[in-house]
Swiss-Prot record:
General function of this protein: Putative cyclic nucleotide-gated ion channel.
Region (Calmodulin-binding) location: 549-564
Protein name (Swiss-Prot/TrEMBL): Cyclic nucleotide-gated ion channel 11
Lineage: Eukaryota, Viridiplantae, Streptophyta, Embryophyta, Tracheophyta
GO biological processes: defense response; response to bacterium; response to fungus
Gene expressing this chain: CNGC11
Length: 621
């Protein structure tokens, strides 16, 4: 019997594991539609930021009815805010479920730089899961929705502004804390959340605006709370006042309350208060005088913008314009505004300065390099036309690279990463070169590993006729002209325009057939007509590739090299022209011989003396 029970339990456990694995498999299919796990975490991080902006909207729900002197609620705002918050919390609950399944059932952790999931130990999982799971549960509990949806329709009692404020605050802190692990995971994989300096500066500016908006929302609710405190204090000073908490609700307010409340709390500026019985509203007097507490629900944008402006103004001014009463809560709120404004302003300025300095630092380095170059050229007494060419090259190189030393950066990488990076940079460009289209990927990879990026300014000479050819250039962008006077005769001249996809410096034939270590002599002069960017391979590297990869010696590749070689094209054109001229000369000489033969035959066949005399006379004439 015990064996059967054990067997039954074992089978049941297997079934549970199978169901869990099935659920995990379905979740993997859903998340498989995302490019990588990091993209999903970025999306969740964005949802958390949106949630931080939604929660303070609960503080705008209470209103004051200026006609009946009672409290009411913006029911439209209640519905909208509850729906949005529930949707975002549901989205985050999906993330929690996926996280728990992948981390507890099949222990996994943050993704690697390529999006691959890395397995962690159980001890690491316990330390990471406990705190974050508790924070996640607290942050997604629908406490504000329950409060505003259950108490408002019943109207059994007034929803205390203080309770609502502390509910939002108690969940706002966990919502901020839960963003930290997501932020660390995203920055660990991407290096930074912001992919550009402008986005980073905008993100810091958004956080500054968010804090201003949150302070404005708390100021709004505290103003209503202060108004309620004034009414209750006035009632406490009057012997015949019978106001209760429920009497302040609009559904229970009566005419007696209206007459009493109309004169109980006059709005007096703190500086003009002379009577000790007058209630001091402190820094909330602006909200009461402006009417934002008494506006209709359809005027919510006006209320929102005014409170946001109040928060932004006082955060930026560090609370210097705030005139508080002797209320401890009000003074503490003013202190928070002052300190947080100082910290946020310092963080904002520091981050913006960091993003700006990352670009201006290189500009300063470039300017310093220009000054050093000018000093060197003056010291060496470089001619003015050479100075202009040097300046033009430095400016062009800066525009293309922004001060990044590409070759030094590639050399600092590990070998496998360097080869993979070069393959990504050069392989597609190499395949666009007609000369290299017949090569397989292994040959192209060998060439990619030895290519270097080069830049040329206008009128720069790449190679001159009669000089040794040390590099072979593949053109990425720009126009060049290739000329030669080497044609086997005096006065010969040939020119060819080179564009993107062409190459110059015919080293392939030399690398394939020549046994000499001396570089070949260029038969052409190549000059840049515009700014040119390309990549080169040295003669030694090309010789090494030709030696190691014997497939370059195939007849098909050799014919293709000759077909695209400018030197072979020039020779072929010269041979064709010479053959055509020989053909024309032979044809002309043949025609002349035929005419001479006809004339000779005509003279021999004419036996008449008169004709001979007449012919001689005609010739004499």
């Amino acid at each position: 019997m015990n064996l059967q029970r054990r067997k039954f339990v074992r089978l049941d456990s297997t079934g549970v594991d199978g169901k869990l694995k099935s659920v995990r498999g379905r979740l993997k299919k859903v998340y498989g539609k995302m490019k990588t796990l990091e993209n999903w975490r970025k999306t969740v991080l964005l949802a958390c930021v949106v949630a931080l902006a939604i929660d303070p909207l609960f503080l705008f729900i209470p209103l004051i009815d200026s006609q009946r002197f009672c409290f009411t609620f913006d029911k439209t705002l209640v519905a909208v805010v509850c729906v949005i918050r529930t949707f975002i919390d549901t989205f985050y609950v999906i993330h929690i479920i996926y996280y728990l399944i992948t981390e507890t059932i099949a222990p996994r952790s943050q993704a690697s730089l390529r999006g691959e999931i890395v397995v962690h130990s159980k001890a690491t999982l316990k330390t990471r899961l406990l705190f974050h799971f508790i924070v996640d549960i607290i942050s997604v509990l629908p406490i504000p929705q329950v409060v505003v949806l259950t108490l408002i329709p019943l109207s059994a009692s007034l929803v205390s502004e203080r309770i609502l404020k502390w509910i939002i605050l108690s969940q706002y802190v966990p919502r901020i804390i839960r963003m930290y692990p997501l932020y660390k995971e995203v920055t660990r994989a991407f290096g930074t959340v912001a992919e550009s300096k402008r986005v980073g500066a905008a993100l810091n500016f958004f956080l500054y605006m968010l804090h201003s908006y949150v302070c404005g929302a708390f100021w709004y609710l505290s103003s209503i709370e202060r108004k309620s405190t004034c009414w209750r204090a006035a009632c406490a000073r009057t012997s015949d006042c019978n106001l209760t908490v429920t009497d302040l609700l609009c559904k229970r307010a009566g005419s007696d309350n209206i007459r009493f409340l109309n004169t109980s709390c006059p709005l007096i500026d703190p500086a003009q208060i002379t009577n000790s019985t007058d209630f001091d509203f402190g820094m909330y007097i602006d909200a009461l005088k402006s009417g934002v507490l008494e506006v209709k629900p359809k005027d919510f944008p006006r209320k929102f913008v005014y409170c946001f402006w109040w928060g932004l103004r006082n955060i930026s001014a560090l609370g210097q314009n705030l005139e508080t009463s002797n209320s401890a809560g009000e003074i503490f709120f003013a202190i928070i505004i002052c300190v947080s404004g100082l910290l946020l302003f310092a963080v904002l300025i520091g981050n913006v300065q960091k993003y700006l300095q990352s670009s201006t630092t290189r500009v300063d380095e470039m300017e310093e390099k220009k000054r050093d170059t000018e000093k060197w050229m003056s010291y060496r007494e470089i001619p003015e036309y050479l100075k202009e060419r040097i300046r033009r090259f430095e400016d062009y190189k800066w525009r293309r690279t922004k001060g990044t030393e590409e070759e030094a950066l590639l050399r600092s990488l590990p070998k496998d990463l360097r080869l993979e990076t070069k393959r990504y940079l050069f392989l597609k460009l190499l395949k666009k070169v007609p000369l290299l289209q017949a090569m397989d990927d292994q040959l192209l990879d060998a060439l990619c590993a030895r290519l270097k990026t080069v830049h040329y300014t206008e009128k720069s000479y790449i190679v001159r006729e009669g000089e040794p050819v040390e590099d072979m250039l593949f053109i990425m962008r720009g126009n060049l002209i290739s000329t030669t006077t080497y044609g086997g005769r005096t006065g010969f001249f040939n020119s060819v325009d080179l564009i993107a996809g062409d190459s110059c410096g015919d080293l392939l034939t030399w690398a394939l057939y020549s046994l000499s270590s001396q570089f070949p002599i260029s038969s052409r002069t190549v000059q840049a007509l515009t700014e040119v960017e390309g990549f080169v391979i040295s003669a030694d590297d090309l010789k090494f590739v030709a030696t190691q990869y014997r497939r370059l010696h195939s007849k098909q590749l050799q014919h293709m090299f000759r077909f695209y070689s400018l030197q072979w094209q020039t020779w072929a054109a010269c041979f064709i022209q010479a053959a055509w001229k020989r053909h024309c000369r032979r044809k002309l000489s043949k025609a002349l011989r035929e005419e001479e033969g006809k004339l000779h035959n005509t003279l021999q066949n004419d036996d008449s003396g008169g004709n001979k005399l007449n012919l001689g006379a005609a010739i004499y004439a």
